[in-house]
Regions:
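N-terminal beta1-alpha1 cap of cysteine-dependent amidohydrolase-like domains
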Residues: 3-320, 325-363, 374-437
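Short FAD-binding loop at a beta-strand-to-alpha-helix junction that anchors the flavin cofactor
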Residues: 366-372
Length: 437
């Protein structure tokens, strides 16, 4: 278990948490807890000297509440001299080999390599008496080499409600970066505030999106900005630009396509318009009587059965995919046949066929949306299959070479039995942190 306590030592907000980790060592034993303290070494501009006094004071404050750091990691923009490490070790009563320098890196993915070179991994395993083999960091080193190498840009528009604070979509933007590294390109994000598109004419929207190689609409809740997302999706569909929709992005894609297929602007979600004539997105009938808070929300890990020949089946390389969910409304099954006849392919559904999990457009080069949040499973050296293929399609649109797909072994049922795959509407049990993601 890793416990991270942020903030500054001495802040009143963090005192209960520091007391908790102090007691943790008493509860589980000295050799089962390791205190790692990360501090900043400020530099004096005139002399260029790195000052250790803030670190000394921080450790003094920790000692005052009963915590003696076992490891100190020193952050700095500049190289840290050996004499500075010795000084910190002397005045904090920490072994000099446990004072780890960590200079600011060009990429956060270089940090694990820096820490390994400094011996942090061996120190942790030795202090906690954990048997561990020498780590094979070949793949990670290759990843860092790709990051350092010059790469052509592929610009992706993220059309969202919360773009004023890009960290609101940090998992999405990082998943794009992971996929871009796989294809040896650089994902450049163009942040588009969906509300501003609602006030634009079609030609203005085209100008706002012109030049992007792909459009991504992430998740969200509430009506604000939804019509702007719908308009961006219409542009991607009509211009045949690669599109990826996540959670609300799928629902907006269904709304946009339904308006075209049904010949009406009144197709909508009952979340946004309870009086809509065509509620193509709606609560399932067995959800409408649930009144407990959160009771109608589908949370956690769910399986989906992927159709043969679909882009999602090709991406995952498996018949069953497991993804995490956090949503309340579903595609209204009443409209599935009519939308299917118009060209929408429900390419992934729950094992019992009741719930739509993935959609595609048959006549579009790459138009995929999922009701799930696949961005949460992407890793730097293992990009999520949907993001990988989305960025690949965007790069191909620019005439850039792309890397082949690398499929991992198909996901197994979290419950471990085929029966778990047949319960389309029942979630597999997931940790609380995943259920609330």
């Amino acid at each position: 278990m890793i416990v991270e306590v942020g903030g500054t030592v001495g802040d009143i907000e963090s005192l209960p948490f520091l007391e908790a980790i102090r007691q943790m060592r008493k509860d589980v034993g000295r050799r089962n807890v390791l205190y790692v303290h990360v501090t900043w070494l400020p530099q004096i501009g005139a002399t260029g000297e790195l000052k250790t006094k803030p670190t000394q004071h921080s450790v003094k404050e920790l000692r005052g509440i009963g915590i003696q750091p076992d490891v100190i990691i020193l952050r700095s923009d500049e190289p840290i001299e050996e004499e500075t490490l010795d000084k910190v070790a002397l005045f904090t009563d920490v072994d000099v080999h446990a004072v780890i320098p960590l200079r600011t890196a060009r990429s956060i993915y270089e940090v694990p390599l820096q820490l390994e070179r400094a011996g942090l991994g061996k120190l942790v395993t030795r202090e906690l008496e954990i048997p561990a083999a020498e780590p094979d960091l070949t793949d990670w080193q290759e990843l860092v080499s790709r990051i350092r190498a010059p790469r052509p840009e592929v610009e992706i528009a993220i059309v969202g409600k919360y773009t004023e604070l890009p960290d609101a979509y940090i998992s999405v933007s990082e998943a794009l970066k992971h996929a871009a590294l796989h294809h040896r390109v650089e994902a450049k994000v163009r942040w588009i505030r969906s509300e501003q598109l609602e006030r634009m004419e079609p030609d203005e929207i085209a100008a706002e999106l012109r030049g992007v190689a792909g459009v991504l609409v992430p998740g969200g809740f509430g009506y604000r900005g939804v019509e702007g997302k719908v308009r961006a999706i219409r542009w991607a569909r009509e211009e045949r630009v690669p599109f990826l929709g996540l959670c609300l992005g799928l629902q907006c894609a269904v709304i946009e396509f339904a308006r075209e297929a049904l010949g009406t602007d009144d197709a909508n979600s009952s979340e946004f318009n309870v009086f809509t004539e065509h509620p193509v997105i709606d609560l399932m009938p067995d959800q409408t009587d649930v009144t407990d808070k959160g009771g109608t929300m589908r949370l956690g890990l769910y399986p989906a059965r992927l159709e043969e020949g679909s882009k999602v089946r090709e991406a995952y390389g498996a018949e069953i995919a497991y993804e995490r969910h956090r949503h309340r409304f579903e595609v209204n099954n009443t409209y599935r046949e009519r939308l299917g006849e118009a060209g929408m392919w429900f390419s992934g559904v729950s094992p019992d066929g009741r719930l739509v999990e993935y959609i595609e457009l048959r006549e579009h080069p790459w138009f995929v949306a999922t009701q799930a949040h696949p961005e949460l499973k992407s890793r730097p050296n293992r990009p999520h299959p949907l993001f990988r293929d989305f960025v690949g399609a965007a790069a191909a649109r620019l005439g850039l070479a792309t890397a082949p797909a690398t499929h991992s072994a198909p996901s197994e049922s979290p419950a471990g039995t085929p029966a778990a795959q047949s319960r389309g509407a029942e979630p597999a049990v997931a940790p609380a942190a995943e259920r609330d993601a």
